[in-house]
Amino acid sequence: GFIDGHTHMDAQVFWDQLGSCSCYHGVTTTVMGNCGFTLAPCRESEADLVFRNLERAEDISRGAMLEGINWQWETYPEYMDAVDKVPKGINYAGYIGHSALRTYVMGERAFAQNPTDDDMRAMKNAVREAIHAGAIGFSTSRSPSHMTSDNRIVASRVAPDEEVCEIVRAMGETGAGIFQLAMKRGETDAMLDFYQSLADLSKETGRPVTFGSLSRKERPGQWKLFYDLIEKENLRGARIFTQVHSREINSLLSFETSTPFDHWDVWCDFRKLPLGVQISKLRSDAVLRRKLIGIADQPYSGPEAYGAEPRPPDWDSFYVMDQIPRPHRSVGE
């Protein structure tokens, strides 16, 4: 079967024996714990510190996690033991996550401060312990898209680059483990420097590095420069593996889940109504329909979207999924 190299099944594994929806696509092994978002290491009394990462970045509700998880761990090896005990239809591998690691060691300081020497020793020891117990590696996030549900940047993004490098070096001492990260964004020259630093770290530690790679509309040719650097550095001994999609990434939006307009004037009150009432009003209230459409046609001026939250509408990138064959009509058309 296929290996799904980037999932966030860390909580779902406790209530979903099948491993959906990965299992529906021929996947027999999933890799969880990406982007630094794991449920361990963490004390049960501090579970909200790790829940908040998954709530906003990955759209997993706190209520589902509270109901579906029987918390039986503190350290990452104990978390692995808990996963091992539940029935599973597919195989799982997991990273130890930087945001969870940071809040476990530093508490609330993780959101505002650099680590002390004692903090660094504790984090490096925890990573070594996790790798020896079977963790597939260490993950972090440098992505500006990753925020907590209480509107703070995730703890790993507070960490200076040298902290990340020190932890990867500690993992390298074990002779095992992959370094996974959610990539930062920036101007081309700055990003080329960052890619070079990853290549240098891989060569220094002997650890492979992996991350998702996207082509962005605002910088359509940037990815080729990055890939040229990666190819060159891999020939020199680095081990960098990008994860790419063979098609565009898409999100399915609906009134049953969320829409890009849920925070807009009039829409926000309308969307608080029960779904059946919304449907009824759309059918019967012509004045309300005109208001909703008029507001949706205006330039967006609401809060910035993060993680799995719906983005403001870009009609040329919204497609009407009314048929199976491509191409699909854009809403702009």
Where are these regions (language model features)?
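Short, function-defining helix-loop hinge/capping sites that tune catalysis or transport
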Residues: 12-16, 34, 142, 251
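Active-site neighborhood of phospho(di)ester-bond hydrolases with catalytic His/Asp-centered motifs
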Residues: 2-6, 32-34, 182, 212
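Divalent-metal coordination cores built from histidine and acidic residues
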Residues: 15-137
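Di-metal (Zn2+ and/or Mg2+/Mn2+) metal-binding site signature of metallo-dependent hydrolases
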Residues: 1-21
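Acidic, glycine-rich active-site loops and adjacent beta-strand->loop/helix elements
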Residues: 8-11, 35-38, 185, 215-217
